[in-house]
Curated annotation (Swiss-Prot):
Keyword entries, A-Z: Membrane, Transmembrane, Transmembrane helix
Domain of life the protein comes from: Eukaryota
One GO CC term, this protein: membrane
PANTHER family (alphabetical): TETRASPANIN-8-RELATED (PTHR32191)
Cellular compartment(s): Membrane
Described function: May be involved in the regulation of cell differentiation.
InterPro entries tied to this protein: TET_plant (IPR044991), Tetraspanin/Peripherin (IPR018499)
Protein name (record): Tetraspanin-5
Length: 281
């Protein structure tokens, strides 16, 4: 029974070790993939995956080798990981709670408005240096090339991703075949048919990027809830493993040299021994 918690914590840390490798792989894939330009989640995933990887190795060493100080360090940093993950999850739900999607009459797809998103997200894409990085990534992807052969009927019948809706075409409300000057969305004037321009500098494109990030971050927050519950369970079992590892170091053989407890005689046993032995003198 004493080794049960050590076995369980070892098994659970193998699972967390595998999970950390998956997280690190996902983060590296985000950085190299040509089909996604999401850099918001790459660094958090790298940091989280690396932290869980190190903790998992420490937990395995401490549980399998009964090293109390390693388990103490493991549990100490596990608290910070759990608290940080809970904070990140809560922040993720707050930031991704609102979508900027607007239904377009007669269309299957939606268009997205930049002003509808959380201010923290907007400050990222409004930053010129950051947007140059995103724009370069979009130009190197196949996001808009898929729409090159679309007909006007396709735009009426087919759905578009947030990036395609915001970056690959002008807003649906734009009117270009008129001689009169009318007030239009500023993005209508940013649009250009050139493949390297399109609507990459439009606010709708920035909104499309934010919508893509919002959807993925919301899914990640849901997964984080499960991860937090799992880590709390691992922490509780780890506390039991720490007690088991600490006991033999501080008390030698707490259950006797051969694993059996040896109780001290009580007062009634001492009194009975004295009473029966007094006639010998």
């Amino acid at each position: 029974m004493n080794r049960m918690s050590n076995t369980v914590i070892g098994f659970l840390n193998i699972l967390t070790l595998i999970s950390s490798i998956v997280l690190l792989g996902s983060a590296l894939w985000m950085g190299r993939s040509k089909t996604t330009c999401e850099h918001f989640l790459q660094k958090p995933l790298l940091i989280l995956g690396l932290a869980i990887l190190i903790l998992s190795v420490a937990g395995l060493v401490g549980a399998c080798c009964d090293v109390a100080w390693v388990l103490w360090v493991y549990l100490f940093f596990m608290v910070f990981i759990i608290v940080a993950l809970m904070g990140l999850t809560l922040f993720g739900f707050i930031v991704t709670s609102h979508s900027g999607g607007v239904v377009v009459d007669g269309r299957v797809y939606k268009e997205f408005k930049l002003e509808a998103y959380h201010p923290w997200l907007k400050t990222r894409v409004v930053d010129t240096n950051y947007w140059v990085t995103i724009k370069t990534c979009l130009l190197g992807s196949v996001t808009c090339s898929k729409l090159a052969l679309w007909t006007p009927l396709d735009y009426l019948q087919k759905d578009l991703s947030p990036l395609q809706s915001g970056c690959c075409k002008p807003p649906t409300s734009c009117v270009y075949n008129t001689d009169t000057v009318i007030q239009q969305d500023p993005d209508c004037y940013r649009w250009n048919n050139a493949a390297t321009v399109l609507c990459y500098d439009c606010d709708t494109c920035r909104a499309g990027v934010l919508e893509t990030v919002r959807r993925d971050w919301h899914k990640l927050s849901l997964v984080n809830v499960i991860v937090v519950i799992f880590l709390i369970a691992v922490y509780c079992v780890g506390c039991c493993a720490f007690k088991n590892a600490k006991r033999p170091q501080h008390y030698g053989f707490p259950y006797g040299r051969y694993g059996m407890s040896k109780s001290r005689p009580g007062w009634e046993q001492s009194w009975s021994r004295w009473w029966h032995g007094r006639d010998r003198y």
